[in-house]
Amino acid sequence: MNNSKSNLLDTEHGDKVAEQMNLASMDCLPDDLLVQILYFLPTKEAISTSLLSKRWRTLYSLVHNLDLDDYIFWHHEDGYNQYFSNDIQKSFEEFMERTLALLGGGHIKTFSLISDEIYRFDHVVDSIRPWLYYNLQKDSLWQFGFPYKVFTSTKLVKLSLGTRLACPRIPQDTSLPVLKVLLLEYIWFEDNQLSDVFLAACPALEDLTIHHMFRPFLISSKNLKKLSVTINFSYYVDRSTILTLDTPNVVDLYYSDFPRPIAPHCHLDSLAKVELDLHSLEDDSRQVQNDADVKNLISEIRNVKTLHLTYSAVELMLSSKKRDWKVLPLLLERSPNLKTLVLSGLNRYTFGRRHRFVGIQIPSSNKIKMLSIKQYQGSATELKHISHLLLKMECLELVKVYLATEMDDLKKMQLTEDVVKLPAASSKIVEKLKAFGAKAVLERVSFLD
């Protein structure tokens, strides 16, 4: 698209924004508030305000966040593409350069770029990098393709990459010395390049989130403090790769996976908070397989202070042919510092022969202070479990029950009374029950939708 068309497009947007905004009524507003208004406008409309007056041009130059998406050039209100592909992409690149030139880039904290034209990115990012990375304090790059030059920045603190993109080779000169937060949304790395090259080039990285359709072979980092791993590949594969978590300093772990017959290798010495969201695999006929092995993972979870097992994790532990339902007592035995226990789906949890109720084995030496029950339905089985837990937890101070579905106040009050009437080993819980009674919304036993 030539410059005349580009200028015409900008003018049209400026007129449109002027029509939509009552400028006279906004003149009395302070600059800080107007900058916030610009922040919530789509980038194309926000930058068009710079054509309205010198004040608006100055105001837009104060915006700290920049979101660029070529969708606004491909799709128009009339429902069809106005220009040919090359013209559209060229127009988008020119728009990017003009926007960054207007902003100056020195004060930008968050930059977001979305585009399908992967092969053009190196040229574009190279042309804007003097602005983009100068005095940049915080950055979030989200796009369907990304230039390799994004891997070299001395200012980048937060980076988000996605989605469904293959990354065959990470540049050997990759260097992100101050990167602290990294999100990888369906990024495929070959071999162990994720850990050997990418993570190795991020010495300050503390928070890593990975969403993946296949298992990465290795996640290794000595400086990570928080790790979230979600594996969405659910089909049964005996020869599946063995996941290795070599993250000895992680204190907060979220792990969602379809465990295989071969257990993952883990090095997790510092865990304090763990949430396990485990699911059963399916074979080629979509039949559930229940021979998952999570012993290595469980054996590495020691001395945690907060343990959360989701409903699906509870179900997997129940159904496993390897009798993995015993891992919960094992976890509790290995966690003398456990203070918070979160359980879901108690209505399906641990039965003995002929459906005889079997309570969860709780070590007598436990120091659990808070118990959270999620997806509570008010069944007799759940009440038995809660009663069993209350009798086994002498240090308990707080019980939270999260309802599976919304309920009216009358039903909620009935469920509250059912729990309040249960005996408890903790003197603090008993004292609170006596003081408040069953009809109160108890401070120590609370029901939440």
Curated annotation (Swiss-Prot):
Keyword Repeat annotated: yes
UniProt repeat feature LRR, residue ranges: 133-163, 186-212, 214-231, 247-278, 286-311, 320-345
Xref: InterPro entries: F-box-like_dom_sf (IPR036047), F-box_AtFBL13-like (IPR053781), F-box_dom (IPR001810), FBD (IPR006566), FBL60-like (IPR055294), LRR_dom_sf (IPR032675), LRR_FXL15/At3g58940/PEG3-like (IPR055411)
Entry-linked SUPFAM superfamilies: F-box domain (SSF81383), RNI-like (SSF52047)
Classification via Gene3D superfamilies: 1.20.1280.50, Ribonuclease Inhibitor
One Pfam family this sequence matches: LRR_At5g56370
UniProt KW Methyltransferase keyword: no
Residues covered by the F-box domain: 23-77
Keywords: Leucine-rich repeat, Repeat
Protein name, entry field: Putative F-box/LRR-repeat protein At3g44090
Upper classification of the organism: Eukaryota, Viridiplantae, Streptophyta, Embryophyta, Tracheophyta
